[in-house]
């Protein structure tokens, strides 16, 4: 009895420690992926891009490159995580991001910056890998809460990235900012290497694994969550590129509109940060399907009045409330997939989500 209790206590300590390491690691790597947004046009200009249209083109390509390759390779890393271990994938991602970010500060041409951004997305994936590890290592009754905490770290990184990128280059220069960011991510690599402990489960027989690989064997709830996750991202992100233009209709100053648009976007992320752990814990108690369904309805209702606001503060309030609803959905989607996934294909199924 004592030995069994000791094993349970040890596992309890490990999953909580893993959660905080993954949350801090996701926070720092998301900062790295988003911090160049404020100074990207200036950096491209220093690399020899002169025309305004060319700067806009290169900015869009360079910024989106990381997220494109990260999305395309997430299922692959999820599959490899199931086979070789989730901790190993996080070590790979943090070390790869540290190297790529440091090299970005040494770029001498726009194409080099784009190539390094592509490389960062290809070698990265720390946040998605953390989601897989936390979801698979956390007790099922705590999955919603744990994923909510991790989601808050991801959202906080998305907010802090542009803020850091707006401050540090003025203090130390753009190239030094990249080098400092690479050094911070290297610390994340060390924390992942020495502090993270994965509780590996013995693999299933080959016949069972082969059955799990067939599309027909994938549980229907998992397929529904894939579609729900795609629609969730589409609904929440599709309007963000035009928020600045929308806000500009309420203020004559374009510079002022940019600041206000940043506040509007931050309001959504702030709402998600505040709501994710609380709604995740609530979903663990009352049911993930119930909370997810309610959140989808609330988001749909909150989207409609955003088209009819007459002042920026109204849009801020609506986007904040929408962030509260959105913050609880990702933990629910992840928890539902986790509950229906086998021990050896959790990473693959979460990677597709």
Named regions from a protein language model:
Residues 100, 111-119, 302, 313-321:
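Paired small-residue
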Residues 71-108, 283-289:
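Conserved MFS/SLC helix-loop-helix module at the cytosolic interface between two early adjacent transmembrane helices
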Residues 14-42, 46, 219-239, 320:
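Pair of pore-lining "gating" transmembrane helices in MFS-fold secondary transporters
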Residues 116-154, 335-336, 340:
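Cytoplasmic helix-loop-helix junction between adjacent transmembrane helices
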Residues 2-16, 197-227:
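Juxtamembrane intracellular "pre-TM" segments in multi-pass secondary transporters
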Residues 177-194:
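Symmetry-related core transmembrane helices of the 12-TM Major Facilitator Superfamily/SLC fold
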Residues 39-56, 242-259:
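Short amphipathic helix-loop junctions that connect adjacent transmembrane helices
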Residues 61-77, 266-278:
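Central cavity-lining transmembrane alpha-helices of secondary-active solute carriers
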């Amino acid at each position: 009895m004592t030995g069994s209790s000791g094993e349970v206590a040890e596992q309890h300590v490990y999953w909580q420690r893993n959660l905080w390491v993954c949350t801090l690691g996701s926070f720092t790597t998301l900062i790295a992926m988003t911090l160049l947004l404020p100074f990207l046009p200036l950096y491209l200009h220093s690399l020899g891009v002169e025309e305004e249209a060319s700067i806009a083109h290169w900015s869009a390509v360079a910024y989106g490159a990381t997220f494109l390759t990260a999305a395309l390779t997430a299922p692959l890393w999820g599959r490899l995580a199931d086979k070789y271990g989730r901790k190993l994938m996080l070590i790979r991602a943090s070390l790869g991001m540290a190297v790529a970010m440091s090299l970005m500060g040494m770029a001498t041409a726009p194409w080099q910056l784009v190539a390094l951004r592509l490389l960062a997305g290809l070698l990265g994936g720390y946040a998605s890998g953390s989601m897989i590890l936390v979801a698979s290592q956390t007790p099922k009754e705590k999955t919603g809460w744990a994923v909510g905490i991790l989601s808050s770290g991801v959202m906080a990184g998305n907010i802090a990235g542009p803020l850091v990128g707006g401050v540090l280059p003025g203090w130390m220069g753009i190239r030094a900012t990249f080098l400092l960011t690479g050094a911070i991510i290297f610390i994340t690599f060390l924390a992942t290497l020495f502090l993270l402990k994965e509780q590996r489960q013995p693999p299933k027989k080959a016949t069972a694994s082969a059955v799990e690989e067939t599309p027909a064997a994938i549980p229907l709830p998992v397929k529904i969550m894939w579609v729900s996750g795609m629609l969730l991202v589409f609904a929440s992100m599709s309007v963000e590129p035009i928020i600045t233009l929308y806000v500009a209709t309420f203020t004559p100053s374009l510079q002022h509109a940019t600041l206000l648009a940043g506040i509007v976007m931050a309001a959504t992320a702030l709402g998600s940060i505040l709501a994710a752990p609380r709604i995740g814990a609530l979903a663990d108690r009352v049911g993930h399907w119930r909370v997810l369904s309610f959140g989808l309805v609330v988001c749909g209702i909150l989207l409609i009045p955003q088209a009819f606001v007459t002042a920026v503060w109204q849009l801020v309030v609506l986007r904040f409330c929408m962030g509260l609803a959105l913050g609880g959905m990702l933990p629910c989607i992840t928890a539902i997939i986790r509950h229906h996934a086998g021990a050896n294909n959790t990473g693959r199924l979460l990677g597709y989500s």
